Amino acid sequence: MADAETRLYGVIGFPARHSLSPVMHNAAFRALGINAVYLAFEVPPEELGEAIGGAKALGISGLNVTMPHKEAVIHFLDSLSEDSGEIGSVNTVVNRKGRLEGHTTDGLGARRALERAIELGGRRILIIGAGGAGKAIAYELSRDNEVVVLNRTPEKAKALERFGITGDALNRENLGEYLEWAEVLINATSVGMNSWETPVPAELLRRDLVVMDIVYKPLKTRLLTEAELRGCKTVDGLWMLVYQGIESFRLWTGFKPDEGLMRGAALEGISE
């Protein structure tokens, strides 16, 4: 039960009601005996600054940031981690004595999720999408892999070239060409969220490809379903959610929750 000592955490996004982060983090707080609660806050873009100011004034201990705020939130924070500053994306906010620090755990979450299916290092990775999550994933994976990012607005993808990442336009021709080259495909867009859409035509998928989708509702997106039918190894978006959540939790509390516990709680949330 909440009391005067209960710490408050949450996720801000638009929409945010679909988020599984509350059930996941609240399960971890209970398991570790931490007096805290985690809520979802639906914040439209025009109210983002007020929301962050309110969180600071109320002493909210930490936030996750999801679409469409991962880039815009930077303008309202006091400091950024090196990674967040480099890529211009934040998915985790830590309140340290009234100063709001921005961090990104998306890239690390994606890395740990992918490592469930393939050993990384020297891999050829194609990422679709150069939004907040896509940039963070590309930046992290480019440390030890060759990464190409395709985006409908090619300028956003090409802006990543200073990190040794290849950026190009997302169109059928480029998609087919780069998929012939790639060992790993990651959908870092929202295409497929609560819909039967896919960013990649099934005929472009080949058997030896590892396919990951950051979308986790539905758990088996059309992309993952068609990839499995083609014989591909797949990684669902819930694993990335779990691993980025574990790192956010560690930044807030200093504790590392159990991944099985967090995924189990998230799976229950999906089925409700």
Curated annotation (Swiss-Prot):
As one GO molecular function, the record gives:
shikimate 3-dehydrogenase (NADP+) activity
| Catalytic activity, reaction form | shikimate + NADP(+) = 3-dehydroshikimate + NADPH + H(+)
**Pathway field:** Metabolic intermediate biosynthesis; chorismate biosynthesis; chorismate from D-erythrose 4-phosphate and phosphoenolpyruvate: step 4/7
Q: Could you say which residues bind shikimate here?
A: S19, L20, S21, T66, N91, D106, Y216
Active site at K70 (proton acceptor)
Q: Which UniProt keywords apply?
A: Amino-acid biosynthesis, Aromatic amino acid biosynthesis, NADP, Oxidoreductase
- SUPFAM superfamilies per the record? Aminoacid dehydrogenase-like, N-terminal domain, NAD(P)-binding Rossmann-fold domains
Q: Which Pfam families does the UniProt record give?
A: SDH_C, Shikimate_DH, Shikimate_dh_N
Q: Which residues of this UniProt protein bind NADP(+)?
A: E82, G129, A130, G131, G132, A133, N151, R152, T153, P154, E155, K156, I214, G237
Spell out the CDD domains in the cross-references: NAD_bind_Shikimate_DH (cd01065)
Highest taxon listed in the record's lineage: Archaea
Q: Which GO terms describe its biological process?
A: amino acid biosynthetic process; aromatic amino acid family biosynthetic process; chorismate biosynthetic process; shikimate metabolic process
So what EC number does this one have? 1.1.1.25
The protein's matches in HAMAP family, at most eight in alphabetical order, are given as: Shikimate_DH_AroE
Any idea what job this protein has? Involved in the biosynthesis of the chorismate, which leads to the biosynthesis of aromatic amino acids. Catalyzes the reversible NADPH linked reduction of 3-dehydroshikimate (DHSA) to yield shikimate (SA).
Which proteins does it associate with, and in what oligomeric form? Answer: Homodimer.
Q: Which family is it part of?
A: Belongs to the shikimate dehydrogenase family.
> Would you tell me the protein name for this molecule?
Shikimate dehydrogenase (NADP(+))
